[in-house]
Structures are given as structure tokens and as C-alpha cells.
Amino acid sequence: MTPVSGEGRRRIGESVLRKEDDRYIRGAGNYSDDINKPRQCYATFVRADIPRGRILSIDTSAALQADGVIAVLTGRDYADDGHGPVVHRAIEGDPIDFRTPAFGGDDPVALQFNQWPLPVDEFHHVGEPLAVVIAETASAAEDAAELVTVDIEHLPSVIDTRQAAAPDAPQIHPEAPGNLCVHHRRGDEEAVMRALAASDTVVSGTFDVSRVAGGQMEPRSGIGEYDSGNDQYVITAGNQGVHRYREMIASALRVENERVRVICPDVGGGFGPRGHVNPEFVLLAWAAKRLGRPVKWTNTRIGSFISDWQGRDWVLDGELGMMRDGRINAYRLRLQGNIGAHTICYAPPANASRLATTAYDIPNASQELQVYLSNTLPVLPYRAAGRPEVHYVLERLIDMAAAETGIDRLACRTQNLIARDRMPFTTPTGLTYDVCDFDGALAHVARLCDWDDFENRRTEAQARGRLRGIGISPFIESPVGAPFEMARLEIDADGNTRIFAGTQNHGQGHESTYAQVVSDLLGIPFEKISLAPGDTGELPIGGGTHSDRSMRMMGTLLHRISKDIISQALPVAAKLLQSPEDEVSFGDGKFQASGNQDGTPEVSILDVTAALAEFPEFRKSAATGLVAVAEQKGRINAFPYGAAAAEVEIDPETGEMTLCNFCIVNDSGIAVNPMIVHGQVHGGIVQGVGQALGENVIYDTASGQILTGSFLDYMMPRADQFPAFQLDEIYVAPDTPADTNPLGIKAGGEAGTVPALAVVGNAVLDALSPLGIAEMDMPFTSANIWKAIDAAART
């Protein structure tokens, strides 16, 4: 049976225009700040202006006298009301989370510290909330916040990774000696050292990966309410998963999960950091109950730079041994990550550690992972979390080794790829890839970027006084995410079909792709299907949207649900067809009976729901036509992979760099909507290239102040900096199916980001190589490039 839509064509695989785009384009989206409640008041936060200190006293008297002020609340008020810290707990039994016994046995690999929404004693970073001011208007609250005086004892701080790791560094938490919250080793280091010693060429380097801000289009915003009749807190806020927010907020308020309801309207960007609750949302819920009124807050853009979770921030030391024929013999890696002031999530170091050898067959590999606390904003997953970083360091080292040996960079990579006939392949870090054709992907992208003709383009650029370079890289992902999910489907008598999902749409096109799957499997018209907003009141559990998991998880659940719906509808369809059930089958979106007598050749699912009133014995609910629920326990593994190439041109007089070309192929499995996958890959490229070329959160290491606190200082990528990307068709190798789920889905949302740092960085260094420049830290801004050129000219 090949399920098709009622219109007689498949919906899975069709580039349908996104349902949600119409309202977004018309400005009719419903974001958190668009929502208002009767009698609402407004909150703003008094924030720490130094990186670390002890609160001696908070004087709120002047603020309380200001016009329109309702209350000024402190951490002492919060604690006195019986509330506690946010518990950023691990998922029990998760075998890939450093914090669980399932990973580390009885001796946890990672330390976990809880986070007070309003600290009573010590605070740990610039921008941390110290008090909340609530007033009748937002402007009144902001003005009054300036009147709050906080008496602080300054405490010594550490800002960057090297400071935190220094032997004499101030200790941020007494439970974390040396500021170290993770120290973990993988591989046989002694064997690696022997293999390095036996290698013909050994290259090494230290590579800094910059810290980035999320830069979401929509600043964080939310409304807290308290429903006294149901004794329930209600928080409406944009996020990446309402159920995780509910759990974290409930942990802080010290109530059962059922007493917290989280609703998510439209979301203007997530990228990872919005998958974990921020303290402000806990405080909105608490203040709403305390005051008996809804409390609303919307962050400012400058406020976002000093209070939103951030991403990346690594120091990577690598050493690569290569034999004379270009075969990689050994690889040793030390990863040092800066997790910031609070241990909210360990996914980035976990991902980096698991994928350290990427797409290569390296016989001897070891790594040491160290994660440090610092007095900076917490670092959380940011698009592709941990994967771009390890690709970057290994690809840089391969280019360096190729330069040392004189071996062509593409040939050097090709001969070291994990061969297709060795799948499934277990890496030195213990990760087992299922089916990947790395050689095919790399060859495909080499054709796309016209690798063989590049030297002619370099010569032509030199004639114009320009420097031209190219970088190429295979890549591999291992998207994981929460190991559980739930979905529900309801079809009413009029055929209106509603999907309830534990995932959370924030730009991925779920309203369209989920509808395409249901339309394809059940034959329901695409236009009749809608996706409900995220709401913990609708589903008891959900995993949220992160780590390229949503379509794989929801596709699996919608497939199960469709089977359930067909099973439920079968008895009614048989009645309508006046045939025994065992003579009725479902195919092509219709029920059909062999040998029916009344001339009715087929019955649709919507015919069944319309007729259910005549057959009450088959109805599950008086209010619903057909309803089905499905739950997934455990991750659905996938290994999307591909290859990418970037080509750049540099003006040596000014350092100005132009990205001339970016090519990528990606085996994302079956694409439910190829246009949406293309869009996701485009966005991923921009975020990866944006970091390589300019994005960089800069802290003053002496004062702890963020120096890039606005878009005047923080360089966001612009459309005019990018060429037309070459994606070709979505690359799906015919013999690399994703058999872990019924729809054959892998992932595509992070593909553009994973290789971007590596291919852009190597392209820049390749362009500069005629000047003798072999090393340079990101970001590769025009200023940094010019400084490198100038320094090379002076030596």
C-alpha cells in the first residue's frame, strides 16, 4: 500500500508552501509580547553589574515610592515564600548524559549545581537578576529599577577558560575544585602517544572557538498568571519545549508538575538556548501569585545580550600523526569548554566528545574533556551543539598535515574516510554509525564546487591582486535530544483535524510538515489539518524541539497514530460499505470493500467521522470524532552526514574577505518537505558562517563586562555577505536508508552549521598561505585578516 492524499498525490516529499508563512508575512503572528491579560502589570529586573559578588543589602524604599510601582521583590522574599532553586536535572537513566549513573556509574562524571532565580547571597555573572520591580506600566517599572540600591561585597572572578583553568584561579564554587565541573577521558592515550611517535609527520595546534549570542529575532517575553480556582501557575512564553519549562519551573516553586501549566505561542527563534528555562519565567509565575495579578515582561535587545544563554566557547588542543602516504595514524585531542556560571546543560561537551573523530577512520585516538565554570552567562546548546567545534579542529589539522606532506587536501581526506563497506562502524569514542557514504558525499561536493579547476580560479584572482582560497570537509551528525515524545490526533465530525505535539515549532515548519504526514497517511486534505500551540495542558509529556529530533520522533508517532485511526475507523467504514470488516481494506487514502453491493466504491476517513453520530458505539468520546494518542520511549538514532566546501577571496590591501561560493550535500534521509529542508540548511549555513566571519561575544577579562552588548558591537551576518548557496538536490544515497523509523527520516536542521567553521576557516587560511600565514583564530573578520597580513609582512 502506498498512502496518498485524498487529492490522489503523495504529500510526503512535496515542497508545499508553509501554512504559517501567510500569517507571519502579514504581521499576524501571535508572539508572547502580542498577548495581554486583563489587569496585567509589568516587571523589569535589577541586574548585577559586576561578574561576582555577595549581596549585603538591597534598599528598595525609593523604588517603592515611585509612581505606579506595585512591588519590589528580592531573593529573600522569594525564599521566605518557600521557593527554591531551579533544578536543571538530568533525565534519569540517560546513558549519554555525564550526570547520570547510566553514564558514569556510581561516580558521576559531571557536577551539577542548582540555580536560584533571585540569589539571596552570592551572584555569579553580569546580568544576573537581583531584584524584580513590578509596576502598572513597563516604563514605570524600568524607571523605578534605577532607584534600587544594592550593597555588594566584590568577590574575585574568572572570565575565560584559561583564567578558570589556572592553578591560582579564584574558586567559583567550593564543590568544584579548580573550577572543574567535568573531567573525562576516552581512548587509550598511551597507545596514541606511541602511534604519534611512530608517525612520519605530526602537526599540532591550539584553536579557539568563539562564544556566540543567540541573536533571536524575538526578545524573550512572557506572562505569569496564577489560577487560584485550580491552584495552578500559568506561564505563557516562547520556548523550545513547554514540558521542560514546566518541570524546571515546578522544581523551583516546589510544587508538583501538574500545578504548572506552560503555553507557548509563536516563537521568533530558538537555536538551542531557549530549550532551558530562564530565571525570569519562574519569577513571573511567583510574582503573579503573590500579587494576585498577571505579570508581563519583555526583554530589551541590550538586555538580551547580558541575560540570554549563550553558546560555543572552546579551547581545543589537537595533535595529529600522519604517515608518509597520507594515512592518519593517530589523533589526540584536549577539549576545554567554558560552561559559564551555572551548570544548566552538558549537551555540547557530550556531543563534542562523542563525535571527536567525525567521518574519519583513525586507528588510534584519545581525548581529554575538561569543562570549567566561569563568571559569565551560562553556555547552552547552540545549533549543532558541540559538533562544529570538533569538526573545526580536526579539519584544520588535516589541512596543516597536508601542507606539511605536500599531499592534495581532497585526496588526503578521501583516503582517510570511513569506508562504506565498513558500516556499521564503531568509532574510537564508542559511537556506532549505521550507514554512511562519506566518500560519495565528498566526491559529490567536490564536483559541485569544481575543486579540480580551483587553481585556475586562484591564478585569475592573483592577476586581479586578490588572494583566493578553498576549504572542503565531510561531516557527520549524531542528533539525540530528549529520549521521549508524545502526540495526539483529533478529527471532528466536520473533518477538522488537529495535531497535538510535544515538540515545539519555532521556525522549522511543523505546521506544514506534520500536516503533510497526516495527509499522506490518512488521505485527509492538507488544508483541513492544523497544529495546536504548545501547551502542557494538552499532553502530559513532551520532549520539545532541539537536536534535529522533531520530524524523526513525530513522524514515527504520526505513523503509529494513523494506524490507530484506520483501525478505529474500520468498523464504521464497514457499516457504510455494508461489508464485513475482513473484506474492507484501507489504501490510497480510502476504505474499499471487495464485492460491496450498494454502489458506494470507497469511504474516506472524513466520511467516517461525519457518520460517527449514527454509530455511537464506536465513538471514544462524545466530543471527538476520532482520536488517537501515541508515545515514544527511547531515542530514535540517526546519522545524517554530508560534505561541504567554501571558497573565499581576500583583498590583501584591506583584509576585506568575500565568500564567493558555499556548496553542501546532505543525506537527511527522506525529506517530508524538501523546500523546508533547503531553508533549514540555508539557515544553518548562515549561522555557522556568521560565527566564522564575525560573531564573537567579547568579555573584558578584568572587569567581566560584556563589550559586545548590542548589534553595534556584535557582528551579525547580513544577506549581502552571502552568495547563492549550491545545495543541488538533497543528497540521499540510495543505499543509505534510515531504517530506525518508518518514514526513513534522518535530519537536516543542523547540516549547514556543522561543517561551516571548518570549511570557511580552511578557505581563509588557504587564501593567506602564499603570504606564509598558517595560523589564525576565528572570527575571520577583515580587521583580523588585515592584522595577520600586516604581521606577516613585518617578519
What are these regions (language model features)?
Residues 75-76, 96-101, 108-109, 254-259, ...:
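C-terminal catalytic domains of large/alpha subunits in multi-subunit enzymes
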Residues 82-88, 144-147, 215, 237, ...:
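Short acidic, glycine/serine/threonine-rich loops at helix termini
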Residues 112, 120-122, 256-264, 287-300, ...:
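Conserved catalytic cysteine-centered active-site region
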Residues 22-23, 146-159, 240-242, 247, ...:
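Extended active-site and interfacial segments that coordinate phosphate-rich ligands
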Residues 14, 20-23, 95-113, 178-222, ...:
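Glycine-rich loop/linker segments at domain edges
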Residues 120, 218-223, 315, 469, ...:
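Short glycine-rich loop/turn motifs
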Residues 270-292, 296-298, 510-518:
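Thiamine diphosphate
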Residues 1-177, 202, 290:
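Flexible, low-hydrophobicity surface segments
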